[in-house]
Amino acid sequence: MRIDIVTIFPTFFDVLDISLLGKARQTGRIALGVHDLRDHTHDRHRTVDDTPYGGGAGMVMKPGPWGEALDGVLDGAEDPVVIFPSPAGEPFTQAMARELAGEQHLVFGCGRYEGIDQRVFDDAASHARVRLVSLGDYVLNGGEVATMAMIEAVGRLIPGVVGNPESLVQESHGDGLLEYPSYTKPAEWRGRAVPPVLLSGNHGAIAAWRREQSVARTERVRPDLLP
């Protein structure tokens, strides 16, 4: 998969050089390009924002630098998906992460200030599939944190990135439920014992217990996930 990021803070994404995603880059499973939006400005202050038409608080990101940056990233690209993190977008879910993991090319546009000029979205939609995506019902200072979260959620679903594919099925949201509680050695710690069923060696009973715990946790914490 090819991933491109347009941002005014390119060093923010240096963390993608480490951990599983860093290894995925080293092995060629993920190719990453980070592009500084300010490289596409033409004034000595490298200005990327201006006051909003119609008045109002804050600044809006100018279409010019965005247009040039996206033109460069999308030139020659085959059927890319351009994602703009936005609290006004569709909610990001595990199902969307699985969908995006099947794409060949993702482009993330990290907005700041009061957002990006609407014409940038409209123009990009004439070259690519554009999606505004919300990480949750809250507002961040910019799109970088949301982009990082989405890249990690998507990247780990690419075949070969996570060592044991079975772990992707068993974790929270893998089957529409929250994950069951996990335990490791020692069998007793500070007077708290591991549930006996997990020590029984009875795989059928263990599977049933885990399913029961997943359903109970989902009912308690996220009842909206249940049918």
UniProtKB/Swiss-Prot annotation:
It catalyses: guanosine(37) in tRNA + S-adenosyl-L-methionine = N(1)-methylguanosine(37) in tRNA + S-adenosyl-L-homocysteine + H(+). Signal peptide: none annotated. GO terms for molecular function: tRNA (guanine(37)-N1)-methyltransferase activity. It is an enzyme of class 2 (transferase). S-adenosyl-L-methionine binds at residues 111, 135-140. One of its GO terms (cellular component) is cytosol. Keywords: Cytoplasm, Methyltransferase, S-adenosyl-L-methionine, Transferase, tRNA processing. The keyword Glycoprotein does not apply. It comes from the Bacteria. The keyword Methyltransferase applies. InterPro entries: Alpha/beta_knot_MTases (IPR029028), tRNA_m1G_MeTrfase_C_sf (IPR023148), tRNA_m1G_MeTrfase_TrmD (IPR002649), tRNA_m1G_MTases_N (IPR029026), tRNA_MeTrfase_TRMD/TRM10 (IPR016009). One of its GO terms (biological process) is tRNA N1-guanine methylation. Homodimer. PANTHER family: TRNA (GUANINE-N(1)-)-METHYLTRANSFERASE (PTHR46417:SF1). Belongs to the RNA methyltransferase TrmD family. This is tRNA (guanine-N(1)-)-methyltransferase. It comes from Leifsonia xyli subsp. xyli (strain CTCB07).
